Amino acid sequence: MTSSVIQGFTKSLAMTVLSEIGDKTFFAAAILAMRHPRRLVLAGCLGALIVMTILSALVGWAAPNLIPRVWTHHITTILFFGFGLWTLWEGFSDKGDEDELAEVEAKLDSDMKTTAAKATKGSKGDDDLKKQKRPFLTSLFSPILLKAFSITFFGEWGDKSQLATIGLAADENPYGVVLGGILGQALCTTAAVLGGKSLASNISEKMVAISGGILFLIFGMQSFLSTVEP
């Protein structure tokens, strides 16, 4: 394993862990795991995060081939400084950890009630048809797995962790970024699913945000001081 892969892996792992712990998708995974089978929630959430990491790394890898590498390097540097200041601002803001956890829980409760209301409108014939198809469909497309996947995927889309992964892949070895990102996502998601709401409620989102902001600023400074070939 080359030094560039190790550097990309280390940066991606640290960034992912500090970005995802206490994130909305972290809380969502913890709450879903309390209401549904953990293995399905873990598979759905982790599957979405792996797909998102790979897609983000591909975009970052392709960027230097479409835009001069010097420009992508400068853009990445600005992103790191911007995300660092943004994350620090979030960490020092007045919003409490319980507020975000309650917000995610309320959103999931609302979605569950909507789904239940739609289900009661189905006819008996539809129920019989669903029962006949259930063994095959459930083995491939579990509703719980799909729910966990969609909530996580769309929750992460456009998030600063996704944009930071794109920036890292543009500036570092993309293979290392993917490996570090996937390992970080696996660690955070597994902790959320196994720890449940009790773990999520005991995490100091403020301290995690401050640590993440400092890390982004360190990455930005390192990128600013480094040189890149045109």
Regions found by a protein language model. Give the residues of each.
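Juxtamembrane transmembrane-helix termini in multi-pass membrane transport proteins
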Residues: 2-74, 164-183
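Alpha-helical transmembrane segments and their helix-helix packing motifs
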Residues: 8-11, 66, 77-78, 132, ...
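Membrane helix-loop-helix hairpins that form the core translocation module of multi-pass transporters
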Residues: 39-122, 195, 211-214
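Transmembrane alpha-helical segments of integral membrane proteins
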Residues: 56, 186-198
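Hydrophobic/aromatic residues within the transmembrane alpha-helices of Major Facilitator Superfamily
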Residues: 13, 17-21, 50-51, 85, ...
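Small-residue-enriched transmembrane helix starts and helix-helix packing motifs
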Residues: 1-21, 114-154, 177-179, 183
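Juxtamembrane boundary at the C-terminal end of a transmembrane helix
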Residues: 222-230
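C-terminal functional regions that serve as terminal interaction/effector modules
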Residues: 213-223
